[in-house]
Amino acid sequence: MARYRCCRSQSRSRCCRPRRRCRRRRRRSCRARRRATRCCRRRYRLSRRY
């Protein structure tokens, strides 16, 4: 398991993994990227299904 930083300078696919750590580190960035995390997770699921 890799450790990601609240998807700050990482790709959207890597930002969908951390969610609890994101809350711990940088709350502003996490809150602003929270939507991106949800989008990322939904896209990753659709990509795996198709």
Curated annotation (Swiss-Prot):
GO terms for cellular component: nucleosome; nucleus. One of its GO terms (molecular function) is DNA binding. Keywords: Chromosome, Developmental protein, Differentiation, DNA condensation, DNA-binding, Nucleosome core, Nucleus, Spermatogenesis. It is found in: Nucleus; Chromosome. The keyword rRNA processing does not apply. It holds the Pfam family Protamine_P1. It comes from the Eukaryota. One of its GO terms (biological process) is sperm DNA condensation. Testis. Belongs to the protamine P1 family. Protamines substitute for histones in the chromatin of sperm during the haploid phase of spermatogenesis. They compact sperm DNA into a highly condensed, stable and inactive complex. This is Sperm protamine P1. It comes from Trachypithecus phayrei (Phayre's leaf monkey). The lineage of its organism: Eukaryota, Metazoa, Chordata, Craniata, Vertebrata.
